[in-house]
Amino acid sequence: MDFLTDWLTNWLKELLIGGIMGNLEGLFDTVNTQVGEIAAQVGTTPAAWHAGVFSLIRQLSETVILPIAGMVLTFVATYELIQMLLEKNNMHEVDIANLYKWMFKTACAILILSNTFNIVMAVFDVSQSVIAQAGGLIQGSTDVSADMLAELETSLEAMDLGPLLGLWLQSALIGFTMKAMGIIIFVLVYGRMLEIYLLTSLAPIPVATLSNRELGSTGQNYIKSLFAVGFQGLLILVCVAIYAVLIQGIATSGDPIGAIWGTVGYTVLLCFMLFKTGSIAQRIFGAH
């Protein structure tokens, strides 16, 4: 009878240990996979992310928004000319050099406005290049080796049946948590790209105000917002990379229960910080 009880207990322990290790191996595999996917997604330029959407946004910007921006620039240039003429004793003293300066300034503003889309894409090309380089470095440092999981399995074998059952239930719960985190990451990464497209579609209007001293703050803040959204991808990548490195420490801690709940805590922390990346990027670049 004792032999049968021992056999059944050992069989259940092996079953639970196998289930726990399966959950944890899948959990750590998910971490590595998500790091790679995020590196690929946030490192993709708007043109390469979705060709159809990119073409639509470009047509909208160049055919609908650009003419409106041209009217804004006309108003800005005319307003500056009137101000310049009235500065010198109500047009009694007109400095010809100032007229040449105004013509040169207006010509530069027209040139910039006509190339707005290319300038905006150049901003994102710079940020995506930095993200791609960082993604290559980060991907190489987040692999969870088989030795780490082997140490964890050894500690599981020394546990009794009751704690193993509870640990298996907890590991299953963590699996659902990781899926929820994947959805949150999906929303953030894809939402960021949609934000980039929306910013790009209306780009000519704020750019048209850059040449004016009083209204130029609108265009300057827009440029800052472009850099903030572009480099937000780097902050997202850094957050997930830090998370993956912390998970490595959990895998080698030798405490299965601590590993499970440590993963829960780090997952919640990651989701919180991912939501904060946008505001952090805006503070860094002074956008508001």
PLM regions: where:
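Binding/recognition "hotspot" determinant
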Residues: 1-72
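Hydrophobic transmembrane alpha-helix segments characteristic of membrane transport
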Residues: 72-108, 202-216
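Alpha-helical transmembrane segments
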Residues: 207-224, 251-253, 282-287
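Non-cytosolic segments of integral membrane proteins
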Residues: 16, 106-202, 236, 240-285
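Internal transmembrane helix-loop-helix hairpins in multi-pass membrane proteins, together
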Residues: 33-65, 85, 89, 109, ...
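Alpha-helical transmembrane segments and their helix-start/interface "positive-inside/aromatic belt" motifs
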Residues: 1, 8, 12-23, 94-112, ...
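Membrane-helix interfacial "entry" motifs
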Residues: 48-63, 90-98, 163, 167, ...
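Juxtamembrane "helix exit" motif at the C-terminal ends of alpha-helical transmembrane segments
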Residues: 70, 74-86, 236-251
